[in-house]
């Protein structure tokens, strides 16, 4: 198995899950959009999380998150750069389930955030992966990647910036959320690997398939959800060996 050079996050946090008590860092039971910037920073700096999932799909989030993180906590993020040491990963809208204008906004945000990060002295784009919820096919993963490339190239044609000229690709993390889709996750990922090889001439350096737990359990029950998750993990292990592509499932 080839070695992955890119750091792989081992712990992920997301915006204020249900808590029994008010958050210790703000002592409030309701976390506003304005508070979420500090929440992300606390997850990184105090709780030691490697990755923070920023929910562009299901929430109206602060779209200036990268700007505010770098400007408020400049020293920390220059020492622990986003996209290299710490990771902010957008969960973007699935255009097969909802309208695409929020995806367009997310992609423009990702691209322009790279401009900002480089201007602040960072050496890497702050966002290098996005999570695609409700993934059902390899075509959806590849289409999302290609759409980002189109947006990035259009932005470069209009607003030239040498620092981010090569930033025109982003990796997509497929979040598979239905039991029936998890049981055939090997087909989804294998089809994607073949598409990727055809498009780029080689296989991806690694993949981070995301296994949902709450939705499968809610829709199909606990036992089917657990069995489907185990099946998906087994599928990914076999695909990793078959194609020599490291798999790092998120669950």
Over which residues does each language-model region extend?
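Active-site capping/gating regions of soluble enzymes
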Residues: 2-14, 118, 186-251
């Amino acid at each position: 198995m080839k070695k992955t050079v890119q750091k792989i996050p081992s712990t992920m946090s997301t915006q204020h899950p249900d808590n029994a008590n008010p958050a210790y860092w703000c002592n409030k039971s309701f976390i506003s959009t304005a508070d979420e910037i500090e929440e992300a920073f606390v997850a990184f700096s105090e709780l030691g999380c490697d990755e923070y999932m920023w929910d562009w799909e299901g929430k109206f989030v602060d779209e200036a998150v990268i700007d505010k993180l770098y400007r408020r906590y400049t020293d920390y993020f220059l020492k622990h750069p986003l996209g290299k040491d710490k990771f902010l990963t957008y969960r973007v809208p699935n255009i097969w389930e909802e309208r695409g204008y929020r995806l367009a906004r997310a992609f423009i945000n990702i691209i322009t955030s790279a401009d900002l990060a480089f201007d602040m002295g960072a050496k890497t784009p702050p966002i290098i992966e996005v999570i695609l919820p409700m993934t059902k096919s390899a075509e959806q993963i590849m289409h999302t990647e290609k759409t980002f490339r189109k947006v990035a190239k259009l932005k470069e044609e209009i607003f030239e910036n040498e620092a981010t000229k090569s930033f025109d690709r982003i990796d997509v993390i497929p979040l598979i959320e239905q039991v029936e889709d998890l049981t055939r996750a090997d087909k989804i990922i294998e089809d994607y690997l073949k598409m990727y090889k055809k498009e780029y001439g080689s296989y991806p350096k690694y993949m981070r398939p995301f296994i949902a737990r709450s939705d499968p359990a809610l829709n199909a029950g606990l036992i089917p959800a657990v069995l489907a998750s185990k099946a998906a993990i087994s599928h990914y292990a076999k695909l990793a060996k078959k194609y020599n592509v490291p798999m790092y499932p998120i669950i």
